[in-house]
Every structure is written in structure tokens, then in C-alpha cells.
Amino acid sequence: MREPALAASAMAYHPFHAPRPADFPMSAFLAAAQPSFFPALALPPGALGKPLPDPGLAGAAAAAAAAAAAAEAGLHVSALGPHPPAAHLRSLKSLEPEDEVEDDPKVTLEAKELWDQFHKLGTEMVITKSGRRMFPPFKVRVSGLDKKAKYILLMDIVAADDCRYKFHNSRWMVAGKADPEMPKRMYIHPDSPATGEQWMAKPVAFHKLKLTNNISDKHGFTILNSMHKYQPRFHIVRANDILKLPYSTFRTYVFPETDFIAVTAYQNDKITQLKIDNNPFAKGFRDTGNGRREKRKQLTLPTLRLYEEHCKPERDGAESDASSCDPPPAREPPPSPSAAPSPLRLHRARAEEKPGAADSDPEPERTGEERSAAPLGRSPSRDASPARLTEPERSRERRSPERCSKEPTEGGGDGPFSLRSLEKERPEARRKDEGRKDVGEGKEPSLAPLVVQTDSASPLGAGHLPGLAFSSHLHGQQFFGPLGAGQPLFLHPGQFAMGPGAFSAMGMGHLLASVAGGSGSSGGAGPGTAAGLDAGGLGPAASAASTAAPFPFHLSQHMLASQGIPMPTFGGLFPYPYTYMAAAAAAASALPATSAAAAAAAAAGSLSRSPFLGSARPRLRFSPYQIPVTIPPSTSLLTTGLAAEGSKGGNSREPSPLPELALRKVGGPSRGALSPSGSAKEAASELQSIQRLVSGLESQRALSPGRESPK
């Protein structure tokens, strides 16, 4: 039988009787496991092996024998309170020689009224595997200590009885015998040892003590069994070194109102409400705030579900018995609904988060000079003053797809392939372009452009890549951003999840099919060119003064293959199938710059005469086989991102759409010595013929509106 503690006195001072003789062995302080020793007795080394009888189980004779054994060991026996002299053994002096210190410690419990409220309802303390602090925290105020002597203050938690409890019908009741006890651990106050003056200056708080149910805990937390009742104890030891604890005098203080039942979740709703009302850190149970209960109610929203994933509860916050979580990190705005999910990584540059780059609202009031949007990674100060740039500087600026969709050939107005001069000659092309929804005047992309990551700095010149736009099937969404030095370039995977009809008319600039060679102008494409072909056809050359090395060929083979994008040998983005207008651009991809436009025009003309391709419903029969073309390093290519269709294989179902003119130019020598005036006239006439072809095709499409392109 456990001897009951005395009734609470005015100072709530009780020498606590330990339930077993070997409650705290000396190894509790010398080993990491922290076992136990007998708190009311200071034993010499020779007496550690002697068994101490339990006074609660022994009779008067056993108690007298224990007193005699202690006397043989050289200890003084003193009686405290009305208990029998053998019931509470106390050493007046430690074995270590110390000066006589006159002290009479008195201990009072802080927040006693709050403890009384919990005690009336049955205090519960939550225990977790990671450790949970107590609330109310165990705080005491000590007085009567010697100001100069040093003291060690510590506490432990022992089983109040040998019963297991359950909460039934709104009350706690005994449910059986207690489970085996967990290892005993003492919690030494972190400020120990300290002088009596320091201890008496302020309340002594053990708020950092944590309770756990993890038997293999390595952090020194107090290990408890769930649904068992426990009693905290407070000890004062006069010693100047923690190593002297086993040989020092312990004064133990017990406050009956601090007993509690360890639980893994609160059982009594009244206890829960009392903790909410008094614990400022109990946000996990409030209906208002950032607690778990509130978030559980609102988790139907996907944004809050994402917030829950990134905001893991910090269950052991300062003086907290409930979970608390860090504030949510700054999150990017949600992506556009048109962006399809994909296993490919989508990286948006920081510049796209700025209003000037990410805002997709139309801005018709902006002039052409202001439409030179900031390339990725440029400072706002440079973007804010486009008027300061001279004409050559503007031609070397890396332009965004928004700029290119409006003026794809800025900086090339004086060249032979000037778009503006051709549109003046062809007013019907301007009217047609204005009526188109996907590349209308002032139309800006509804999705911020994405970029592709290269292994090294991009070798493109300032005007090498004007941009890339898709057909009306994609509703004018921009596909690529300008390739800047060191800027990532990733392909939007949502565009690849479409049927072949989505790519019925697609214009790509000098993108992935460039052949490394000498200096020369690089080709471009844009939806506003005269060779508009439903998605922008072949664009004129960019600034001829650009002498930077062309785009590396290994990008198309290695980088895109690593991302799961199919890539043909010669270059290009979509091997096959593609629709009827692709062959005109593909034919030009294998020709020198001086004859590319003529070949494209002739190929397009043959396509219009083809019985299969001239119909309103285009066929998807193209041979994927390609014939390599030998190109001298001195020539540059006016390329598109499509696979080269220079000639058809022997097993192709269709005749070759490339006329003799194009074949003669391919087989002939490089015509690098043509006069600029002759090449300009030839290119202008060929582009005009392509324009007439497009007008005829669109008229055929208008005559059969019910026919749709194959999906």
C-alpha cells in the first residue's frame, strides 16, 4: 500500500514517499538513461548495494532494521512531520564536507487557482511521440534559501497509483491494472546550479519539460503511459555540482492539485475548453485562427489544401500543447486555366512575375516604341525608357513574343524582306491579318511565355530569335520567349497534348534547326508576315549585321530528347504528322537563305495543285524520311522548326511537291554573290505569290465552313 501524503499545509510542502525502494538509482544522473535514486536519502558508495526495505510494506521491526542499517552506514536519521521516524529518512549533511548552511526552503505553487480548476475536472496532459509540453506549466516560487549557497532544482513525474483509467460517462474510472512503468527520468532545471539569491529572485518554471510516450526516446523527455495518473514532484538539492546529486540532500515537494492523467487526445471537452481559454498557444482547437480544426473545415478549397501541405504543424511550440504552424510562404499566383498539367518542369522567370511581363490584358494605347517589352532578366530602368535606344540598338534588342506578334521584323525595315513594305503593297493582307482573332492588332498572349533551359549561355545574337506563334487553334498563345544569355527555355507541355490539327499552320523562327556556320542573317517567323499561311509562314531575315554564332545544333538533339520531346535528325520540333502547309516551310529549311523563299513559294504552289492537299480537308500523309543536304559553312539558313521535306522517299504515296526550280537550286552551287537588288525583287515576288496562294486557300475554307480540320 502506498502511504498517503499529508493534507496540504499553507506552504503546500510535503515530503513525498516513494513507491519502491529502488525508485531512483544513482545511474539516473551518471548515465544518459537517467534511472532513479531514493529521493529522501543520501547514500554512501558502500551503501548503494544494500537493499532498502519499503516502509509501506514492512512492519515496525523492518522499519527499525532499516534505521539500524542506515546508522551503520554513518547516516543520521531525522523524522519529518508526524510520520514514524523510519518512514522518512533524511541526511542532515552530505558526505562531501560543506560549511554549515542555515536554510529553511519554502515552496509555493504558481497559478494555484488555475491548477485547482483543472484538478476539479480531472487534469489531462497530452503526450506525443515527439514530446509535448505541459499546460498549465509547472511553476513554483522558492523562498528561505541561503543567498550564497548553490542549489540544484529538479523535478520528476511518478505514477500516482497502479491503476489504468478510462473516460466513461463524462468521468474518469478505473479500467484495470497499470501497465509496466516507463524508465524514470529526472528533469534538471537548465539554470542549475545557481545561488539561492538567483532562485528566489523569480519564479522557477519547468515549462520546457516535455512528455512523451516513445519508449526509445533519445531527447531526455519524460516517458509516460497513456491513460495513467501521474504526480509531478519538485526537488531542491544543495550542491554546487550536478555530479554530487547522488550524495546530496534532497528536499521533495509535492502539490496534489498538479496530478494529471496522461492522454494522447483530450477526453473531457471541459478540459479542452479550459485550456483554450487559458493557453494562448492552443490554436489547434480554436474555431477562429489558424488551427487544425479551422483548416480541416476549409480543406475543400484546393488553395487551402496546398497551404496545408506546406504548413506542417509545429506541435511543440513555445509553451504549447497544441499544434502551431509557421506562416505560409509567399506563393506564386495560380497558373492560367489554359495551362495543362504535365510531367515536364515549368519554370517561369522572375521577370514574368512583374506586371509588365505577366499582365495579359490588352494595352491598345501603348505605342510601337513602348511595345519593346523587357527581355527576361533586364532591369526595370532599362525597360522604362525605350525611347532612348537608337534604331540599331532596337534592332539588336531581344524582343518578346508580344513584340514579335506585332512587328516581327523590327530592325529589318531596310532589308529586302521588309514586312512593312510588303504590307503596303498588299493592303488585302493587312485587312486579312486584322480580321484574324489569334494574331489581331494589340492582341497579347493569355499565357506568359516559357523558356527552355540550355546547358550553356545562349550563343544567339540579339535578333536571332524574334519569336514563335501558333495558329488559331491555340488562340494566340505565345509559345516561346526570347532566348537570352543564361535564361531557361522550357517548352510548354500543354501545347504538345493536342491533335495534329492544332499544328495545321505553324511558323517558327530560327529556333532549333540551325546549322553551325559562319556569319549571316538568321531567319525568323511571325504570324504577321506577308507569307501568313494561317499561322505565319516564313518570316524575313533579322538584322543582317548580326554576326554571332548560330544556335547550337546539339540543343535540339540532347536537350529536347532529355525532356521527352521527339526530334528528327536534321532538326525540327515536330517530326510528323503535320498538315499541308508544313511542307512549304519544311522545303525552305534545307535551302540557303537566298533561295529559301523561292523554294517555299514553289513548293506551296505545287501543294495547291496537288489533288490531295488542295482539298478543303487536308490530309496527313507525309513521309518522315529525310534526305540530308550538304550545305557549305558559309551559308546561313532561313529555317523553321519543322522537319526538312526536301524530297519524298521512293515508297511515298504522293509525288514530290518540290518543283524542278527548287531542286535545281538545291543541287546547284551556293549563290552567295547575288546582288542585293536582284535578291530583294526575287524574294518580294515569291512572297507575293505565296500570299496569293494563302488568299485562295482561305477562300476555299470560307466556302466550306462545315468542314473541320482533322483532330
Swiss-Prot record:
Biased composition (Pro residues): 326-340
UniProt region (Repression domain 1 (RD1)), positions on chain: 518-602
A Pfam match: T-box
Entry-linked CDD domains: T-box_TBX2_3-like
InterPro entries: p53-like_TF_DNA-bd_sf, T-box_DNA-bd, T-box_sf, TBX2/3_TAD, TBX2_3_RD, TF_Brachyury, TF_T-box, TF_T-box_CS
Residue ranges, compositional bias (Basic and acidic residues): 363-372, 390-409, 421-444
Residues bearing PTM Phosphoserine: S336, S342, S360, S623, S652, S656, S675
Biological process according to GO: aorta morphogenesis; apoptotic process; atrioventricular canal development; atrioventricular canal morphogenesis; cardiac jelly development; cardiac muscle cell myoblast differentiation; cardiac muscle tissue development; cellular response to dexamethasone stimulus
Region of interest called Disordered, as start-end residue ranges on this chain: 313-449, 640-687
PTM section of the record: Phosphorylated. May be phosphorylated by p38 MAPK in response to UV irradiation stress.
Record's keyword annotation contains DNA damage: no
Effect of substituting S675A: Abolishes phosphorylation
UniProt subunit comment: Binds DNA as a monomer. Interacts with CHD4, HDAC1 and HDAC2, perhaps as components of a NuRD-like complex. Interacts with CBX3, HMGB2 and PBX1. Interacts with PML.
Entry's free-text remark on domains: Repression domain 1 (RD1) is involved in transcriptional repression. RD1 is necessary for its interaction with PML.
Described purpose of this protein according to its UniProt entry: Transcription factor which acts as a transcriptional repressor. May also function as a transcriptional activator. Binds to the palindromic T site 5'-TTCACACCTAGGTGTGAA-3' DNA sequence, or a half-site, which are present in the regulatory region of several genes. Required for cardiac atrioventricular canal formation. May cooperate with NKX2.5 to negatively modulate expression of NPPA/ANF in the atrioventricular canal. May play a role as a positive regulator of TGFB2 expression, perhaps acting in concert with GATA4 in the developing outflow tract myocardium.
Protein name in the entry: T-box transcription factor TBX2
Upper classification of the organism: Eukaryota, Metazoa, Chordata, Craniata, Vertebrata
Gene symbol of the encoding locus: Tbx2
